[in-house]
């Protein structure tokens, strides 16, 4: 089973050229597109696309390719956002808390926050009873959790994991060329 990357900051960056940005934008929308189609869309051969994909994977730009399920299509899925405040601060206590989250398959995402709350945790569970058990197990009697607040999601307005890749100056140039229209 691959290691999950919950709340782990990245230490390096990858310099993207315009072809990289175009290709990665296409992949973020549909990673199952054939190489020849991706190549046609960005002006590269299928083998050149394959070389770039290999480079993205080896450098960590592409962390993994997965199938994203629609929670609405899977009967009984309950989504919740949990805000968590820790009692005490230390590297060890944060690491222990993060390990708890990494071990829970129902935790979809987690974010280390600045502000009143320490973490935002996204939970997906099969039904409300299971969601309550998961949240209670993770936070109710957890050592070092001072407070948590659960927000149940009625209706997702936008879902996505896409990272914006266009450079701000490119967007500004595009707007200027279109007469300022968005």
Where do the model's predicted regions map?
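A compositional/biophysical signature of low hydrophobicity enriched in polar/charged and small residues
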Residues: 1-182
């Amino acid at each position: 089973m691959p290691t999950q990357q919950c709340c782990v900051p990245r230490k390096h960056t990858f310099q993207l050229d315009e072809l990289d940005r175009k290709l990665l934008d296409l992949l973020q929308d549909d990673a199952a597109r054939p190489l020849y189609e991706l190549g046609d869309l960005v002006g590269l051969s299928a083998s050149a696309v394959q070389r770039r994909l290999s480079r993205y994977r080896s450098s960590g730009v592409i962390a993994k390719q997965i199938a994203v399920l629609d929670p609405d299509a899977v009967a009984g899925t309950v989504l919740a956002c949990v805000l968590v405040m820790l009692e005490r601060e230390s590297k060890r206590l944060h690491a222990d808390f993060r390990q708890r989250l990494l071990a829970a398959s129902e935790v979809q995402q987690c974010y280390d926050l600045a502000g009143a709350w320490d973490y935002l945790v996204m939970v997906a569970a099969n039904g409300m009873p299971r969601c309550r058990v998961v949240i209670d197990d993770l936070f109710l009697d957890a050592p070092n959790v001072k407070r948590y607040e659960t927000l149940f999601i009625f209706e997702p307005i936008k879902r996505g994991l896409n990272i914006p890749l266009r450079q701000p100056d490119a967007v500004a140039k595009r707007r200027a060329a279109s007469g300022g229209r968005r």
